C-alpha cells in the first residue's frame, strides 16, 4: 500500500497513557502517512484494532492531520455520506464494474475488473485484465463461482461484456448466467449511481491504491491489486458496516457452481422450437436475438 512502512509497529498491546501529546501525535501521523486517503474515524478504528489504547477522539485526529498538513480535498470528499439501498444477506446480489482503464509503464492498457458483494461490501475480485471481452472475463467469474458459490443476482452496467446498447436480445454473458440460474440486472443508462457501492469502491481503489503506484505490467498490477484487496476486506473499516470490515460479514453462497449446464425442462403444454444461431425462428413471430 501507499506511504511509509510500519514494519516496526508490532501488533502487541500498546498503551499511551503516560506519553506526551507530541509522542501520541507522532504515531498518529505515521499511520496517516501509511494510509493517506483514510479518514479520522476509520484510522482511529484501525489503530484500535492494532491494540493502541487511550487514543484521542477522531475529532482530535482531524486536528492533528490539519496541523501536519495531512488533510486533502479527496479525503474530505470521500467522507461524504450517501443514502444507499442494501441487500439483506451475502450473495443476494453481486455488483460488477470495470474501473476506467489506464496505460501501464509497458505501454499496455490495464482494465481493472472489480466485483463486490452488495450486503457485506466484500471485494470478491480485483483483477487487472487486458480487455473487457466476455472471453477474458468469463474465467475470472468462473473462479469466483467455484470459490464463493453462485449469487442470486448480478448487477452490472450496460457496457461490454455485460449488456448491450440496444434494448433487444441477450449477450453471451446474460445467457450464461441465465443457464446458471443467476438473474442479470442492469443499471439505468447514464445512471452510474445505480451501482453506488461498486462506484464507491472504484473511487476508494483509485484514491487509496492506484494514486500511489506506478504499475509496470500485468504481473505487477496483480500483486498490487491483491494487496489492496486484502487491506480493503480485512483491515479498512467501513462506515456503513459500523466500522467493521467486510470479511466479518461475508459468508460463501450455499448455491454451488457446476460448469455442466443442466438441460432446460418444460411442461407438456409448451411447444419447443429450435432456433437459428441468431435466435430467430422463421415459423414464429417471436424473435429472440442473441448477441
Predicted regions and their residues:
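K/E-rich alpha-helical interaction surfaces of small helical-bundle regulatory domains
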Residues: 1, 36, 226-242
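Basic, flexible linker segments flanking DNA-binding modules
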Residues: 2-96, 101, 171, 247-255
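Short, polar/charged, Gly/Pro-enriched helix-capping and turn/loop motifs at alpha-helix termini
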Residues: 42, 75, 151, 155, ...
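Residue-level "edge-of-site" marker
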Residues: 60, 78, 158, 189-191, ...
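RNase H-like DDE/DDD metal-dependent nuclease/strand-transfer catalytic core used by mobile genetic elements
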Residues: 88-95, 100-112, 118-220, 224-226, ...
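C-terminal, beta-rich DNA-binding module of retroviral/retroelements integrases
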Residues: 233-291
Amino acid at each position: 500500500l501507499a506511504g511509509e512502512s510500519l514494519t516496526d509497529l508490532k501488533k502487541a498491546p500498546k498503551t499511551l497513557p503516560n506519553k506526551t501529546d507530541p509522542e501520541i501525535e507522532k504515531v498518529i501521523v505515521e499511520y496517516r502517512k501509511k494510509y493517506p486517503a483514510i479518514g479520522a474515524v476509520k484510522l482511529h478504528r484501525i489503530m484500535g484494532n492494532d491494540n493502541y489504547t487511550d487514543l484521542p477522539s477522531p475529532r482530535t485526529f482531524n486536528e492533528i492531520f490539519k496541523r501536519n498538513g495531512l488533510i486533502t480535498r479527496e479525503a474530505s470528499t470521500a467522507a461524504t455520506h450517501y443514502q444507499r439501498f442494501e441487500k439483506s444477506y451475502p450473495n443476494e446480489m453481486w455488483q460488477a464494474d470495470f474501473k476506467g482503464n489506464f496505460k501501464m509503464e509497458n505501454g499496455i492498457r490495464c482494465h481493472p475488473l472489480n466485483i463486490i458483494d452488495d450486503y457485506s461490501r466484500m471485494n470478491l475480485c480485483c483483477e487487472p485484465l487486458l480487455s473487457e471481452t466476455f472471453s477474458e472475463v468469463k474465467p475470472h467469474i468462473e473462479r469466483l463461482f467455484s470459490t464463493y458459490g453462485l449469487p442470486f443476482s448480478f448487477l452490472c452496467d450496460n457496457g461490454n461484456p455485460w449488456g448491450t446498447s440496444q434494448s433487444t436480445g441477450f449477450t453471451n454473458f446474460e445467457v450464461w448466467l441465465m443457464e446458471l440460474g443467476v438473474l442479470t440486472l442492469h443499471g439505468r443508462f447514464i445512471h452510474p449511481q445505480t451501482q453506488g457501492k461498486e462506484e464507491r469502491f472504484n473511487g476508494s481503489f483509485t484514491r487509496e491504491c492506484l494514486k500511489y503506484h506506478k504499475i509496470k505490467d500485468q504481473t505487477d498490477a496483480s500483486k498490487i491489486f491483491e494487496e489492496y484487496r486484502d487491506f480493503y476486506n480485512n483491515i479498512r473499516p467501513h462506515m456503513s458496516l459500523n466500522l467493521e470490515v467486510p470479511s466479518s460479514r461475508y459468508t460463501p453462497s450455499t448455491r454451488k457452481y457446476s460448469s455442466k449446464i443442466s438441460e432446460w425442462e418444460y411442461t407438456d403444454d409448451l411447444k419447443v422450437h429450435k432456433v437459428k444461431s441468431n435466435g430467430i425462428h422463421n415459423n414464429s413471430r417471436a424473435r429472440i436475438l442473441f448477441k
